[in-house]
Amino acid sequence: MFKPQQCALLVSLACAGQAYAANVPEFAGDPVVVTAGRVAQPLSRTLADATVVTREEIEESGAQTLQQVLSRQAAVSIASNGGPGSASSIYIRGNKDSHTVVLVDGVRIYSATLGTTTIQNIPLAQIERIEILRGPASSLYGADAIGGVIQIFTRKGEGEPRWNAGVEFGSRGTGKLSAGVAGKSGSTAYSLQFSHAQSDGFSATNSRNTDYYNPDNDGYRNDSYAASLTQTLSPGHDLTVRLFQTFAEADIDYTNAWKGQDRSKSRLTGQSVESKNRFNDVWTSTLRFARSQDKSEEFHNGDFDRRTSFFQTTQNEWQWQNDLSTKLGVFILGASHLDQKIASDGTYTKNSRTTNAGFVSYQLELGKHLLQASLRNDHDDQFGGKMTGKAGYGYRFADGWLARVGYGTGYKAPSFNDLYYPDSGNPNLKPESSKNTELALQYRKDGRSASLTLFQNKVEQLIQWAQTNPADSNSWRPSNVDRATIRGLSLEAAAQWLSIDWQGNLTLMDARDDKTGSWLANRPRQSASVSAAKQWEKWTLGAEQQVASRRAGDATNSEAKALHGYGVTNFFANYRFAKNWTATARADNLFNREYETAYGYNTGGLGVFLGVRFSQ
């Protein structure tokens, strides 16, 4: 933590300078990203591997789920245990799904028992923008950010009231409804958005899944809302309240109790109160209290009176961030206090955890040179203190070009299930840690962009299930048994050619267990995505192609559980038939390919979806 004298010195240094205009994009169409440095900055000046997905891009593509949107991004792969509403895992740069932090409007959404986030229950209708940060970010966001951060921003109010609504129907009994309004009246900005989705689904499991195979249709239902209210108390001083909730019900085939246990209910909630105060051209303070809850229940044969499992995580977090913009650069000083508590129908020997953290970050632009550094100390009441850091340097050697190098460390504390799950937890586990190095070359100018990133991440104390006593078949426990090295490169490009908007990416990756030499499960060694969209009068026509190579389906790389490579083609069309009105169409898996992203679990065949959207 910082001493008062050190803070005073930084404040006095800041007040001596002029405002640092780091949040003003240089190039037309240069997206602004917040997640990469905890302050707004143009993507072209960001010393991190980051991507911004806008509302316009989501609507144009007609994507059905958040998993679809994420799977099209470079160095991001998704493994799903079936169709809509099924458990899904995110692998950023080949890191474990528990190595990704997911934020909704700055609020961490997380299951402290599983150690992951139920992204399958976050509907696209609520999303205004998605920011994806690849690489270690523990020095900015604390535990779990070994692989990266995904931040979801819900819709915000500004200007005249803008209404939106949409309806969509399609294959497998799919139906969606959404409606909302956002705007500003005087000194009050507001937004309110509702959505509903349902599907009859398809069988989550296939015959390769000998433990849980149940050839029925696994349906899904999701209801959600998001709301925000911002009151400007005086110029530069805003008070904001945000609410977010999704409620989902799903048929499931992935439980490990018995095959008949096949219904689940889950709820994600997030609430926050934030005071943002710009005291002068130098100092901006943001104080936030956030509360989130992840609740999941499972039931036998759809009988909601016969609950068979229950897990709930409640998180309360205070966070204070101070941005000091000076002619010497941008200083960020912050502190946070996080309380996590779990509840379950099982008995855990410990059900709460407290983490206190202090962090500092620095950003400088000096001529053609860019510098960013951050340092954070997290003190966990179970594991003590953990220091993480990150440093990056960039050189703008030509108009639109940036070469950069970076190094960072990350860590993850074991989940409550890893530590204390009844009869199988291991309270002696140590946190996982990582060291990441990357080199990148990127170009962004006049609506064209390209980047090449080389990365290597070494993860130590990797937690995997292991047999602690070879003579006892019941002695399997989570254990710090492995180290892993993940090397790779990602290539991205976007441009207009022949009056067609092109976007594409390619990822090559070598992700291995250092101890055994085996490939890490569910990580494709090669993957690529390309999309093309053509606007013609009132029409937008487009297509997507996604390919992924062969992958290991388990940690032992057994041939019987291998996941074969695949290629999937999607098509979309939009027709603007009146002011603010658009008819939409999308075909997923146009050629009805059969493939798996997780061993023993199906993906959807050909699906056709038609809709109408109103948007002011």
Where are these regions (language model features)?
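Outer-membrane beta-barrel signature, preferentially recognizing the C-terminal barrel domain
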Residues: 257-278, 311-316, 381-382, 396, ...
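Extracytoplasmic beta-strand/coil segments of soluble accessory domains associated
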Residues: 67, 71-107, 128
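Periplasmic-side early beta-strands and strand-to-turn transitions of outer-membrane beta-barrels
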Residues: 138-139, 151, 158-160, 166-168, ...
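Short acidic/polar hinge/loop motifs at secondary-structure boundaries
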Residues: 107-134
